[in-house]
Design a protein with these regions (language model features):
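N-terminal active-site wall of soluble small-molecule enzyme domains
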Residues: 171, 178, 198
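Short, small-residue-rich loop/turn micro-motifs
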Residues: 105-108, 116, 170, 174, ...
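Active-site-adjacent C-terminal substructures of enzyme catalytic domains
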Residues: 196-230
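Acidic (Asp/Glu)-rich catalytic clusters
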Residues: 47-51, 89-99, 175, 179, ...
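Divalent metal-binding segments
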Residues: 1-85, 102, 106-162, 179-183, ...
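A short acidic, amphipathic alpha-helical/loop segment
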Residues: 42-46, 165, 169, 200-204
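Glycine-rich phosphate/ribose-binding loops and adjacent secondary-structure elements
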Residues: 150, 167-168, 172
Length: 230
């Protein structure tokens, strides 16, 4: 902060307003943002109340590995974790359906390029098997409360170990909170990227009705180094 001053709330709000205006000028009618800082959501609520939200926005609240809102970015004075408030209150949708937040994004592991994706075996070109970002002791309470209160979950997982552990924890949560005690009987949670999955885990997506949210662009983006890494 000695070299680059910390942004102010008004600067962040102005940046969002400019981005919204440009997006509307380009013809965008809706944006989905997966893994938003909680502070951005608060500012968009304010912009919406002022009547300046020109496009529909659906946001997923981003979280770090310790179960806190991503970046700890909150513009209200409160000691309570924003994630806890969101989990208790359930999905947010304004009266005009312009701004909504129906879910939380978790992160199981890193990426292949940085060798952070969590694999069952070590990388071919480095002595590591990647790492896990989330922790079970902070993640499971989130999954259980999300099932009770109708909150969608999407989890970033790229390595086969990251995907397997995510499936394991989803399955454990589904067993503990059965369909009778869920706000949404069939929540259809997602695993984002789902890039490397062992054959025995593939059928589990179908059995648990989990969406394998894959992006074809990653096949191209990882093309030049995936062969060496794996």
């Amino acid at each position: 902060e000695q070299l680059i001053p910390k942004k102010t709330i008004s600067e962040d709000k102005e940046a969002l307003e400019v981005a919204l205006r440009i997006s509307a000028q380009l013809g965008w009618t809706q944006i989905q943002d997966a893994g938003s800082p909680f502070g951005d959501f608060q500012l968009l609520q304010q912009i919406n109340k002022e009547g300046n939200l020109d496009i529909r926005i659906q946001m997923y609240l981003g979280m770090d590995g310790s179960g806190h809102a991503e970046d700890g970015n909150s513009y209200t004075s409160t000691e309570r974790n924003p994630v806890d408030t969101f989990l208790d209150e359930g999905p947010y949708l304004d009266d005009e359906h312009m701004l909504s937040s129906r879910g939380i994004k978790l992160y199981a592991d890193g990426a292949i390029g940085s060798r952070g994706a969590a694999f069952l075996d070590k990388y071919n070109d480095y002595d590591t098997d990647g790492f896990l970002i989330f922790k079970k002791e902070t993640t499971m309470p989130i999954l259980l409360k999300a099932l009770r209160n109708g909150i969608q979950i999407q989890t970033h997982a790229i390595g086969d170990r990251g995907n397997r552990i995510t499936l394991d924890w989803y399955e454990e949560a589904f067993k503990e909170i059965d369909s009778v005690n869920r706000l949404i009987e069939k929540p259809r949670w997602r695993i984002e990227h789902s890039q490397n999955i062992q054959p025995e885990d593939q059928v589990r997506f179908k059995d648990m009705d989990i969406i394998a949210s894959m992006q074809p662009s990653h096949a191209i983006g990882d093309l030049h180094f995936a062969g060496k890494r794996l």
